[in-house]
């Protein structure tokens, strides 16, 4: 399967390189996401397109791309390699596997501006990029923890659902969550701190696969009928509304009584719908459209040698049933 993804990625790059006169006219600002199968990243694409429509006379074009599958870490690294070889003007990367991406950047030593968007490189490797544009992911985890504490002041049993084990943004959110609950930095696992205990078998890792995320939720609910809280550090399961509805149908009575609470990251349309149906208690929303919309301008600043802030944070939206805010119907 990975071979097929690599072929698709290479074919995409070759097709772009063969674009003829248009490719000569416009210099390319590339945004490389973790995978084209994730609707969160489609919002970044819409932001990229919006920038292009608002800057028709620019000498630059905004190119949104990524491997076909979010699970194809090697494909993403290869795509970045191919784009740098092709000669894009600048590149913004959301690294799926931060150490692997950093290792390749060290090897190819691109002379073009490199930045990260949505997800960053590991702290030790951040000199390899000029800036990060996206969410304050540690703060996002803090805000998730605050909702858990508000909804269940006494704590309880909890399962965290994470993405890729090497994704810096997801790990930062998990750290923010655990540190806030425990009131101590560097908390690796909750074992009674603040009244909360992570159950055996958790955290679970989705590897950014939506179907797996829903199956994991179903399995956890079945194996732990008295679970107090399930936290989707990213939105994965909710990106498939039918599957997510089926999974939460089995625990709707517990959700309605707040015996079981669900807190999730992101506020894409299917997630807002699920929230308004009572299938989650709080959503902490990122702003991916803004990331895609702002990334080209930041890359142009870097090309021009201008100073840019590092990091550049986009905001967060909090939805609760008491104050639905962004998620209001």
What residue ranges belong to the model's regions?
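Bacterial N-terminal signal peptides
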Residues: 8-17
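Bacterial N-terminal signal peptides that target proteins for export
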Residues: 1-9
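A residue-level marker of the well-folded mature domains of exported/periplasmic proteins
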Residues: 3, 21-329
